[in-house]
UniProtKB/Swiss-Prot annotation:
Motif (GXSXG): 381-385
Residue ranges of every copy of the PNPLA domain listed in the record: 338-544
Keyword terms of this UniProt record: Cytoplasm, Hydrolase, Lipid degradation, Lipid metabolism
GO MF entries: phospholipase A2 activity
Organism: Plasmodium falciparum (isolate NF54)
Gene3D superfamilies reported for this sequence: Cytosolic phospholipase A2 catalytic domain
Family statement: Belongs to the patatin family.
Residue ranges annotated as motif DGA/G: 531-533
CDD domains: Pat17_PNPLA8_PNPLA9_like
Disruption of the gene: reported phenotype: Gametocyte maturation is delayed. No defect in exflagellation of male gametes, formation of macrogametes and zygotes following gametocyte activation. At the ring stage, levels of phosphatidylcholine are increased. Dispensable for asexual blood stage growth.
Protein name in the entry: Patatin-like phospholipase 1
One GO cellular component term: cytoplasm
UniProt cross-references to Pfam families, sorted A to Z: Patatin (PF01734)
EC number: 3.1.1.4
């Protein structure tokens, strides 16, 4: 045994070792040398404290080489931090880092306004988590801060890096002079933009005045002009809001001020997240302005100086669209609606009906490029029907949806679950199911899709009595007339909407207020969402009421004046009776949901009868497809024989009972499509 092996190191000896070459060049180490001669108190001085913080000895203990990834460390000097541009050339995904992490600092210029997601994955071997005897875990910690032009102009901008610089005074003077110069430029730009906006408003006002003069020849024209003026002046005032931070004149980005929604959705501009070993997390943020800056500081937490294998990325999740763009004319033509019932695996029947209808439509028009979804102004769904609606909103082809559907539904309802196991093991495999929704639906937000109006139903069990909650891609300017105004939100990613609408109690725990907050999304009042089938297994009537509300008309007037076609597809499913009666201070459990849901379930056929009565005077308007003899099949069945039974029963139904109705509907949709495109 060598002398070195015989030597016993004590705490003070460890910190009296000579510095390595790297440490001599390190400003942090030089600062520690200043304190190395300070008086010792309780066997510990300032020098030992600082050196313990850096944990370089443990690095040398576990590995002969310094395991810090020096290439990925950014300088403390803000001028030396590389500015990353994102997105670039329609590349909406960027892998920022994948490897052994100690500490990385990034400054990213977000070139587009819209929603973003930060993804962090900790691939550390969990065996190291026992180093603290189970009291804590080695984690990846990420601090982020979104800095917009508004923050900079207001003088609120500060760099996240809090490390000391060698020449603090000179740096402060430099920053101060640069700040004064920047403020002067910003003031000039702001004045220029304000003057420009005033000039544009004067021009627009002059044009409106000239329109009044030209249309002043007759009383009838004057009346028409008066109506036009009242309508468009309000619309113009809302649209042409001055934005002191951009050169464009658009809607105010704070859309909550321009609608009647009671629920608000906000995002943090700075926060901190920690990811344990073998876990991954998403955090979402909303950038209102082009060319904002996102600062990231990613480092290990409670790792004793060891590096952690991880990766993290940045995703662009779509632009926020104001839907409808013109709230006074939400529909440019008579409205066609597609409504899809819930029903688990029974929605195989729904897809067969949709595919058959699309085939007939293409035959009528004579083109294989036409999509069925192009013929509808609103698409909605509940539970599994909601998943299909979201897939169509994402513009996935019907055939592709059909191909992936059995495996998707199987994963959502995976396992032999019953009411007992559902109550006591709620949330079983919820992370795996969330991964399925992420893979199938993606991270883009509902409001980033504007091809047609879309909503999926959910049930809010945070408040009693439980109530219907809609996840939409649009907002309402008006309240309903002589009807209920349904609550809802539109600033959520598609996968979260899918999780909410398909969270059938005893199968899948729905997203609670805490789950949503962990994603960086703050919804007020708080919500806890589960399967929409508890309130509306058939959303056809809800769709009619939503369209009437968008048009600012009562339901009867909308049906008489604006409705063209309503297509409702059922699943033959009679909902199983579960077992309702303020706000709950905690998330409702599966047991509470079951106990309080005896009278919540609405049968799909009851809704069908009510819609039929309301549309009795409208010929060739309402089309309902609901395959018989499949309602007794369990919605979570994994039996291939049940799949075959559903397929055969649906094919027989379409080619026997509904053969001519399919052709009649396809002919009507084809004529509507041709008129809207070419006439």
């Amino acid at each position: 045994m060598s002398d070195d092996d015989d030597k016993i190191y004590i705490y003070s000896d460890l910190f009296s070792k000579n510095f390595s070459d790297d440490e001599k060049d390190d400003s942090y180490e030089r600062e520690k040398q200043v304190y190395s001669g300070s008086e010792t108190q309780n066997a510990e001085n300032e020098y030992s404290k600082l050196r313990a913080q850096n944990s370089t000895i443990l690095n040398n203990y576990f590995d002969n080489d310094n395991i810090k990834n020096v290439e990925n460390l950014k300088s403390n000097d803000p001028d030396q931090i590389d500015l990353i541009l994102f997105p670039v050339n329609k590349n909406y995904y960027m892998n920022l880092f994948d490897g052994q992490l100690i500490e990385n600092i990034h400054s990213i210029k977000l070139r587009k306004a819209g929603f973003y997601a930060i993804y962090v994955e900790n691939n550390n071997n969990s065996k190291w988590d026992g180093i603290y005897f189970g009291l804590s875990r080695m984690q990846v910690e990420l601090d982020y801060k979104l800095i917009t032009k508004k923050n900079k102009d207001g003088g609120e901008y500060e760099k996240r890096n809090t490390s000391s610089y060698d020449n603090t005074e000179s740096v402060q003077n430099t920053v101060g002079s640069e700040k004064e110069e920047t403020e002067n430029k910003n003031e000039e730009t702001s004045n220029y933009n304000s003057n420009l906006n005033n000039e544009i408003n004067k021009i627009c006002k002059y044009n409106l005045d000239q329109t009044d003069i030209l249309l002043d020849d007759s009383n009838s024209e004057r009346r028409r002009n008066s109506k036009f003026k009242i309508k468009n002046t309000n619309y113009y005032d809302n649209l042409m809001l001055q934005n002191k931070y951009t050169n464009s004149i658009l809607y105010d980005d704070d859309d909550d001020k321009n609608n009647t929604e009671t629920y608000t959705c906000t995002f943090k501009t700075e926060d901190q997240i920690r990811v344990p070993s073998q876990k991954k997390k998403y955090i979402y943020l909303y950038n209102k302005y082009d060319n904002a800056t996102l600062d990231l500081n990613v480092h290990t937490y409670m790792s004793l100086g060891m590096s952690i294998l991880c990766k993290y990325s940045l995703l662009y999740c779509g632009k926020y669209n104001h839907i409808p763009r013109d709230p006074y004319t939400p529909f440019k033509k008579p409205v066609s609606i597609l409504s899809l019932d819930g029903g688990g695996i029974l929605t195989i029947s729904t897809l067969l009906v949709l595919n058959r209808l699309e085939a007939e439509l293409r035959k009528e028009i004579g083109s294989d490029d036409i999509k069925l979804i192009d013929c509808f102004d609103m698409v909605c769904g509940t539970s599994a029907g909601g998943l299909i609606s979201l897939a169509l909103l994402r513009e996935i082809d019907l055939q592709d949806v059909s191909n992936m559907w059995p495996s998707t539904i199987k994963k959502v309802f995976e396992g032999n679950r019953n009411i007992i196991s559902g109550i006591f093991f709620e949330g079983y495999d919820v992370n795996n199911v969330k991964d399925v929704f992420l893979e199938r639906m993606g991270n883009k937000f509902m409001s980033s899709y504007k091809k047609f109006y879309c909503f999926v139903t959910a049930t809010d069990v945070k408040h009693k009595p439980y109530k219907l909650f809609l996840i939409r891609n649009y907002t309402h300017k008006y309240n309903s007339i002589n009807a209920e105004s349904y609550d809802g939100i539109n600033k959520v990613p598609l996968w979260l909407a899918a999780w909410a609408t398909a969270s059938a109690p005893t199968y899948l725990k729905g997203p609670s207020a805490e789950d949503i907050k962990k994603l960086g999304i703050n919804i007020k009042p708080e919500i806890h969402l589960v399967d929409g089938a508890l309130k509306a297994s058939n959303p056809a009537l809800i769709a009619l009421e939503e369209c009437a509300r968008l048009n600012n008309k009562n339901l009867s007037t909308f049906i008489k004046e604006d409705l063209d076609t309503l297509v409702s597809i059922g699943t033959g499913q009679v909902p199983t009776k579960l077992t309702q009666s303020g706000a709950s201070s905690k998330s409702a459990s599966t047991f509470e949901i079951l106990i309080n849901s005896t009278h919540l379930l609405t049968r799909a056929n009851d809704t069908h009868r009510e819609v039929l009565q309301r549309l009795a005077d409208r010929e060739n308007t309402y089309f309902r497809f609901n395959v018989p003899h499949i309602g007794d099949i369990e919605i979570d069945s994994q039996d291939v024989r049940d799949f075959d039974l559903i397929s055969k029963a649906t094919q027989d139904y379409l080619f026997d009972e509904k053969f001519y109705e399919i052709k009649r509907l396809a002919h009507k949709l084809a004529n509507n499509y041709i008129r809207s495109k070419y006439l």
